[in-house]
């Protein structure tokens, strides 16, 4: 009888078969062990006082289906998670808050995510504990594309504070100082008016006209120039940006966050994204180079000029500085992408709500006629005398909430929020859509009612709970400029036209298209000259 250590394969058995079986069994055992350890780890996390939430699955957490392309997601496996495919993530998370509370948590893989769904928890986190809740989560796709520079996605720290402080003060300068964008916005509206009137009484989509106008205002701010709506290079860059955002949000590019080297795959959306990056980079870097060649220290014309002058000042002081061409490039990208998409969609929502609510549109027309008349362009100085128009814009912002989940935050250290433990490195989602639909704060929150922003005397009522631009250290740095654009462009549109939906058309779906921003579904309007 042979010993156990001297066993030989039976007759006819392949020599490597037993080894293969043992290896397979060992691999399965390791997988089971990993699943068990993951399950134990997740259970321990729940026991450590973190906010309540659904039970996570081992390894994949609560949203494992998000790791799989939509067309490969089997319905039987998704269960309730499939609702994220039929409603926006902001709506789905708001529904979860009804079950688990205004502060709840879930896991994506092993990553803990905490969602804040009401104003009080948002204010405590972003204002009262701002130093803890102001970082950004590490995401390989974003890190590769931005080199962790710029303002929007950069990590919170001394360099970010320097760049943010300069950018914010420069934007304020353009909003209030001698380089104010007000006349440029009014000038741009002349092109909007001309483009819309070409359609006569025929239905048309306002999207390309509004998008071109808002993009040109950002170009005036950043580049000191505007582009004709028929300029092929300008249209191409806008198309690149739109396509880049689309494939980042709705394709297999999310796999880069799991395996960063996927970014370099030579096919599909991976290859397309790299080409889009190269084309946009070429466009922006050419403009920066032109500014360097024509820079006049005594007469800065735009954001790039101001940044280049500050760079020279820092270098002349012979001190280490974070101000360089790389940072300028990514900040310009932030301003262009974030500033164009959000304001464009806010204006589109305004036109849609006016088309659906002719009674409100009529009151806006009456206030414009009373304060401004028909013979002069609107000015920011008119704002104080136009509370109903302001309230209308604010109500559209509240209901549309074009950035429904804000940009994700991350905790830089362990903390406690309203009695719950929030570990260091937790991803924090701010559901601004839920904050602005909270029935505890907003009466009949789903109704369109501008009067909720007016007091008994018809004057504008400033509500602390109205935070469409966010709050805290990461509040939108372009808030003032966005408000200026929205007011001047909206009033100019209302002063000139009456908007309506085409006769016989169906009412557009008002849920919006969830992406980087919450855009209205495509719609057409008709106009009549006033």
UniProtKB/Swiss-Prot annotation:
Its cofactor is heme. The keyword Magnesium does not apply. The chain crosses the membrane at residues 21-41, 99-119, 247-267, 328-348, 481-501. Its EC number is 1.14.14.80. InterPro entries: Cyt_P450, Cyt_P450_CS, Cyt_P450_E_grp-I, Cyt_P450_E_grp-I_CYP2D-like, Cyt_P450_sf, Cytochrome_P450_fam2. Its main location: endoplasmic reticulum. Pfam families: p450. GO terms for molecular function: arachidonate omega-hydroxylase activity; heme binding; iron ion binding; long-chain fatty acid omega-hydroxylase activity. It is an enzyme of class 1 (oxidoreductase). Widely expressed. Expressed in heart, brain and liver. It comes from the Eukaryota. Heme binds at residue 476. SUPFAM superfamilies: Cytochrome P450 (SSF48264). GO terms for biological process: omega-hydroxylase P450 pathway. The keyword Metal-binding applies. One of its GO terms (cellular component) is endoplasmic reticulum membrane. Keywords: Endoplasmic reticulum, Heme, Iron, Lipid metabolism, Membrane, Metal-binding, Microsome, Mitochondrion, Mitochondrion inner membrane, Monooxygenase, Oxidoreductase, Transmembrane, Transmembrane helix. It is found in: Endoplasmic reticulum membrane; Microsome membrane; Mitochondrion inner membrane. It is a multi-pass membrane protein. It catalyses: an omega-methyl-long-chain fatty acid + reduced [NADPH--hemoprotein reductase] + O2 = an omega-hydroxy-long-chain fatty acid + oxidized [NADPH--hemoprotein reductase] + H2O + H(+); (5Z,8Z,11Z,14Z)-eicosatetraenoate + reduced [NADPH--hemoprotein reductase] + O2 = 19-hydroxy-(5Z,8Z,11Z,14Z)-eicosatetraenoate + oxidized [NADPH--hemoprotein reductase] + H2O + H(+); (5Z,8Z,11Z,14Z)-eicosatetraenoate + reduced [NADPH--hemoprotein reductase] + O2 = 20-hydroxy-(5Z,8Z,11Z,14Z)-eicosatetraenoate + oxidized [NADPH--hemoprotein reductase] + H2O + H(+); N-[(5Z,8Z,11Z,14Z)-eicosatetraenoyl]-serotonin + reduced [NADPH--hemoprotein reductase] + O2 = 2-oxo-N-[(5Z,8Z,11Z,14Z)-eicosatetraenoyl]-serotonin + oxidized [NADPH--hemoprotein reductase] + H2O + H(+). A cytochrome P450 monooxygenase involved in the metabolism of arachidonic acid and its conjugates. Mechanistically, uses molecular oxygen inserting one oxygen atom into a substrate, and reducing the second into a water molecule, with two electrons provided by NADPH via cytochrome P450 reductase (CPR; NADPH-ferrihemoprotein reductase). Acts as an omega and omega-1 hydroxylase for arachidonic acid and possibly for other long chain fatty acids. May modulate the arachidonic acid signaling pathway and play a role in other fatty acid signaling processes. Belongs to the cytochrome P450 family. This is Cytochrome P450 2U1. The gene is Cyp2u1.
């Amino acid at each position: 009888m042979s010993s156990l250590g001297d066993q030989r394969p039976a007759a006819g058995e392949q020599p490597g078969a037993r080894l293969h079986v043992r290896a397979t069994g060992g691999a399965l055992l390791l997988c089971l062990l990993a699943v068990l350890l993951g399950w134990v780890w997740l259970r321990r996390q729940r026991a450590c006082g973190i906010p309540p939430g659904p039970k996570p699955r081992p390894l994949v957490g609560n949203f494992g289906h998000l790791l799989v392309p939509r067309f490969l997601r089997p319905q039987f496996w998704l269960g309730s998670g499939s609702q994220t495919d039929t409603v926006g993530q902001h709506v789905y998370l708001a529904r979860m808050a009804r079950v688990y509370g205004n502060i709840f948590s879930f896991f994506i893989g092993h990553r803990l995510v905490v969602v804040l769904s009401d104003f009080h928890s948002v204010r405590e986190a972003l204002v009262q504990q701002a130093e803890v809740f102001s970082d950004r989560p590490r995401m390989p796709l974003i890190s590769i594309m931005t080199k962790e520079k710029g303002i929007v996605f950069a990590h919170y720290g001394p360099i970010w504070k320097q760049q943010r402080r300069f950018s914010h003060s420069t934007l304020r300068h353009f909003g209030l100082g001698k380089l104010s964008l007000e006349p440029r916005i009014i000038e741009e509206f002349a092109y909007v008016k001309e483009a819309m009137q070409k359609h006569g009484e025929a239905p048309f989509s306002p999207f390309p006209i509004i998008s071109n106008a808002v993009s040109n205002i950002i170009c005036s701010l950043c580049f000191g120039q505007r582009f004709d709506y028929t300029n092929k290079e300008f249209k191409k860059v806008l198309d690149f940006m739109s396509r880049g955002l689309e494939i980042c949000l709705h394709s297999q590019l999310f796999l880069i966050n799991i395996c960063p080297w996927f970014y370099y795959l030579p096919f599909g959306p991976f290859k397309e994204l790299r080409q889009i990056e190269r084309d946009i980079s070429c466009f922006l870097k050419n403009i920066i180079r032109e500014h360097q060649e024509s820079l006049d220290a005594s007469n800065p014309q735009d954001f790039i000029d101001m940044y280049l002058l500050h760079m020279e000042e820092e270098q002349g002081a012979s001190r280490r500085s974070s101000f360089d061409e790389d940072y300028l490039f990514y900040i310009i990208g932030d301003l262009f992408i974030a500033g164009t998409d959000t304001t464009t969609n806010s204006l589109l929502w305004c036109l849609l709500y006016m088309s659906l609510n002719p009674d409100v549109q009529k009151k806006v027309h009456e206030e414009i006629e009373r304060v401004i008349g028909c013979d002069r362009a609107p000015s920011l100085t008119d704002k104080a005398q136009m509370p109903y128009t302001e309230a209308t814009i604010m109500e559209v912002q509240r209901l549309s909430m074009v950035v429904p989940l804000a940009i994700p935050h991350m905790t830089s250290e362990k903390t406690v929020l309203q009695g719950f433990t929030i570990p260091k490195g937790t991803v924090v989602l701010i559901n601004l859509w839920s904050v602005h639909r909270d029935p505890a704060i907003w009466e009949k929150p789903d109704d369109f009612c501008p009067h909720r922003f007016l007091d008994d005397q018809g004057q504008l009522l400033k509500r602390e709970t109205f935070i469409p631009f966010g709050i805290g250290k990461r509040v939108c740095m372009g808030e003032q400029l966005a408000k200026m654009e929205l007011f001047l462009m909206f009033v100019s549109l209302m002063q000139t036209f009456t908007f309506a939906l085409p006769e016989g058309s169906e009412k557009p779906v008002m849920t919006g298209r969830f992406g980087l921003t919450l855009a209205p579904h495509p719609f057409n309007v008709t106009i009549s000259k006033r």
